[in-house]
C-alpha cells in the first residue's frame, strides 16, 4: 500500500484473522454489485470525456474494478474502434457510457450490442424507452443515473437493471443534492435493482458506510483521472495533486434568465473570465444589442472545447479542469491497481475497526 494512503499504525495493525473476517464481510456487502458487474470489486470507473478511454478503462477492469468507456460525442465508427481497442487490452468486463441526447444514440447502442458489451450506461437525461428496450433485447444490462427517488422509481418501472445515484460532490455536470442526502432518500426504497453511489468518494472507508446503507458498490471518477494510466496531460494531473477539496467549485450563474448548467471543476482563470463574460453578455442584452436567444448562445459557447484543452493540451488555466471534491484526496499520481488496492484495504480496515468497537461494547 502506498505511503500517502496508509490507514493504520503498527500499534493497531489488524491481525490476519481480523483482515480475513473483514474481507468476507466486505465481499458480502458488495456481492450484489460484483455479481451484477462480473468483477472482483464493485468499483466502477466514472465515465469522463477525453479521459475514460481504452488505457484507463482496461486498467480499471484489469485491477478488478469495472471500467467504463466515455462515448461522449464519438461517432458510431469511432466508438466501435475504441471498444475493440479496449478488448485488446483486457479480457475482463467493462461498460460503455452513452449520452442520451446524442443524435445517433440508436446506432451507438447497436455498436455496443454488436461488440458484445454487457453493460451500457445511459447518462445525460431520462433515457428513451426505446433505447432501454433495444439494450435489454440485445442481451445487455442497462445502468441509468437518478438524481431523485421519484425518478429512480420511474426508471425501475422502465426496465433499467441498475441505478447510479450521484451527489453534487462529483466532478463535471452535477445536480444540486449531496450524496449523503440522496443515499438516505433513495437507498431504503429502491431494493429491486442494484444501486451504486457516486460523488465525493475518495476512500474505501467512505464506501463501506454506503454499502452498509444498502448500496451495491461505488463509482469513482476523480480518483482515477490522475492515475498513471490516464492519458490526461501531466499538467492536468499535477493540478489534481495540488488541489484541495474546496478548489473544486461549481460554475457561477449571474442571471436566472440565462441558465448555466452546473459543472464542478477546479477554479482557474477561465472560470473567472466566464463570470466576466456573462456580465458583458447580460449588459449587451439589456442594451438591446443581443436577443435573449443570442445571449444564451454566447454564454453557452464560452466553454466550447474547454475540457479537451485541459485534459489533452494541458491548459489548466483556460481549460475546464473538471474534478470532484474528492480531488483533495488525490495526493500523487498512482497506478490504477494501487488506487484500487488502497480503496479495498481502507474498506477492510474500516470493517476491522468497526468489529473491534462492537467487540469492546459486547
Place the predicted regions along the sequence by residue.
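Residue-level detector of alpha-helix initiation sites
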Residues: 51, 201-202
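Active-site entrance/lid segments in N-terminal catalytic domains of soluble metabolic enzymes
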Residues: 2-194
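Conserved active-site-proximal phosphate/metal-binding subdomains
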Residues: 2-13, 178-196, 202-362
Amino acid at each position: 500500500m502506498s505511503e500517502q494512503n496508509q490507514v493504520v499504525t503498527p500499534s493497531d495493525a489488524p491481525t490476519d484473522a481480523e483482515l480475513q473476517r473483514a474481507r468476507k464481510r466486505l465481499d458480502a456487502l458488495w456481492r450484489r454489485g460484483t455479481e451484477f458487474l462480473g468483477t472482483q470489486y464493485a468499483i466502477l470507473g466514472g465515465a469522463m470525456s477525453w479521459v475514460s478511454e481504452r488505457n484507463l478503462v482496461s486498467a480499471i477492469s484489469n485491477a478488478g474494478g469495472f471500467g467504463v468507456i466515455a462515448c461522449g460525442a464519438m461517432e458510431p465508427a469511432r466508438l466501435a474502434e475504441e471498444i475493440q481497442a479496449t478488448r485488446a487490452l483486457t479480457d475482463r468486463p467493462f461498460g460503455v457510457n452513452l449520452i442520451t441526447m446524442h443524435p445517433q444514440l440508436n446506432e451507438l447502442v447497436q455498436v455496443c450490442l454488436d461488440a458484445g458489451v454487457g453493460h451500457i450506461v445511459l447518462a445525460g437525461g431520462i433515457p428513451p424507452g426505446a433505447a432501454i428496450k433495444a439494450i435489454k433485447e440485445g442481451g445487455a444490462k442497462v445502468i441509468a443515473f437518478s438524481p431523485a427517488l421519484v425518478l429512480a422509481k420511474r426508471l425501475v418501472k422502465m426496465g433499467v437493471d441498475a441505478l447510479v445515484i450521484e451527489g453534487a460532490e462529483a466532478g463535471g455536470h452535477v445536480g444540486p443534492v449531496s450524496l449523503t442526502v440522496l443515499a438516505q432518500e433513495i437507498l431504503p426504497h429502491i431494493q429491486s435493482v442494484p444501486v451504486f453511489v457516486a460523488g465525493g468518494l475518495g476512500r474505501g472507508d467512505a464506501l463501506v458506510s454506503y454499502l452498509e446503507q444498502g448500496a451495491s458498490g461505488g463509482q469513482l471518477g476523480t480518483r482515477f483521472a490522475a492515475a498513471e494510466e490516464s492519458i490526461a496531460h501531466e499538467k492536468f494531473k499535477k493540478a489534481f495533486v495540488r488541489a484541495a477539496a474546496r478548489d473544486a467549485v461549481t460554475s457561477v450563474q449571474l442571471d436566472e434568465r440565462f441558465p448555466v448548467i452546473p459543472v464542478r471543476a477546479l477554479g482557474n482563470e477561465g472560470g473567472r473570465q466566464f463570470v466576466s463574460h456573462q456580465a458583458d453578455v447580460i449588459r449587451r442584452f439589456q442594451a438591446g444589442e443581443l436577443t435573449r436567444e443570442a445571449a444564451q448562445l454566447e454564454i453557452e459557447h464560452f466553454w466550447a472545447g474547454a475540457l479537451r484543452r485541459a485534459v489533452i493540451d494541458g491548459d489548466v488555466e483556460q481549460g475546464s479542469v473538471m474534478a470532484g471534491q474528492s480531488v483533495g484526496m488525490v495526493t500523487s499520481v498512482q497506478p490504477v491497481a494501487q488506487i484500487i488496492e488502497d480503496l479495498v484495504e481502507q474498506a477492510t480496515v474500516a470493517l476491522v475497526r468497526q468489529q473491534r468497537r462492537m467487540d469492546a461494547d459486547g
